[in-house]
């Protein structure tokens, strides 16, 4: 595996009128493993993902993926380079089966597209068969293959999150962006998803996640960067982040820091 970073932010800024959401952000996501980006509400974390996936242009600096500058690329073009994303708000097709949901995720890599696959015309049957086999395999990775024919709306909240993971993987990415993957989950669902993300990472995918649940992040990520008021204020492993005074202050302020600090940062949370 190359030592070169998979994703690089080099002096990236993003302004909305006079509002500076990101300022001179330098960030490197290494190949392999699980990288976390954390920070207080309004720090600019989601903007980092929106810039990476082409939903917004940068105001300054550059973003490179595998050495390629992403400037000017449309979201679907960025997907084809090998970047996939899930969103904080679940976006599954609730009236479609799990299998169909995952097959739709394959459209950018199929000769006939998703509509052709779902139409099951004779011209598309060979490709459809391969796509269905791959979709079932991806569902098995998140332990949903036994529900492949079920309607997505009948899944639990946690299962819909896992379906989103499978659909994102269907685009054949190298880099998987997870936007608050455990938002709204209970403790058991979080533990289950942590296992699935570790399994995905072990298969060779690079995972880059934004998450507010500090225990989840500290228990899962090998590398973490902290964003505050649009600037990176700390980077390192969980132990470094947990004990960095700048990070504690960013989350709590000086007065609360002096009163004892944040338990999730200090204890490190789930293992």
Enumerate the language-model features and the residues they cover.
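Glycine-rich phosphate-binding loops of nucleotide-dependent enzymes
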Residues: 2-271
């Amino acid at each position: 595996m190359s030592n070169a970073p998979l994703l690089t932010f080099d002096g990236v800024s993003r302004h909305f009128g006079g509002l500076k959401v990101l300022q001179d952000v330098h960030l490197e996501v290494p190949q392999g493993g699980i990288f976390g980006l954390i920070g207080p509400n309004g720090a600019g974390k989601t903007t980092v993902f929106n810039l990476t996936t082409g939903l917004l242009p940068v105001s300054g600096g550059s973003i490179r993926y595998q050495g390629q500058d992403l400037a000017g690329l449309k979201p679907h073009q960025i997907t084809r380079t090998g970047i996939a994303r899930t969103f904080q708000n679940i976006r599954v097709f609730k009236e479609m089966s799990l299998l169909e949901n995952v097959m739709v995720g394959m459209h950018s890599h199929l000769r006939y597209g998703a509509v052709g696959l779902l139409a099951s015309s004779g011209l598309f049957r060979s490709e459809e068969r391969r796509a269905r086999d791959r979709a079932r395999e991806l569902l098995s990775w998140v332990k949903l293959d036994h529900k492949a024919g079920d309607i997505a709306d009948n899944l639990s909240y946690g299962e819909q999150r896992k379906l989103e993971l499978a659909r994102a993987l269907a685009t054949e990415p190298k880099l998987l962006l997870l936007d608050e993957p455990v938002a709204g989950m209970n403790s058991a669902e979080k533990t289950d998803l942590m296992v699935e993300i570790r399994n995905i990472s072990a298969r060779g995918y690079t995972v880059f996640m934004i998450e507010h649940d500090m225990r989840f992040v500290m228990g899962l990520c090998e590398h973490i960067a902290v964003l505050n008021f649009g600037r990176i204020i700390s980077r390192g492993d969980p132990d470094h982040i947990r004990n960095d005074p700048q990070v504690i202050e960013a989350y709590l302020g000086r007065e609360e820091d002096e009163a004892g600090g944040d338990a999730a940062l200090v204890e490190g949370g789930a293992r």
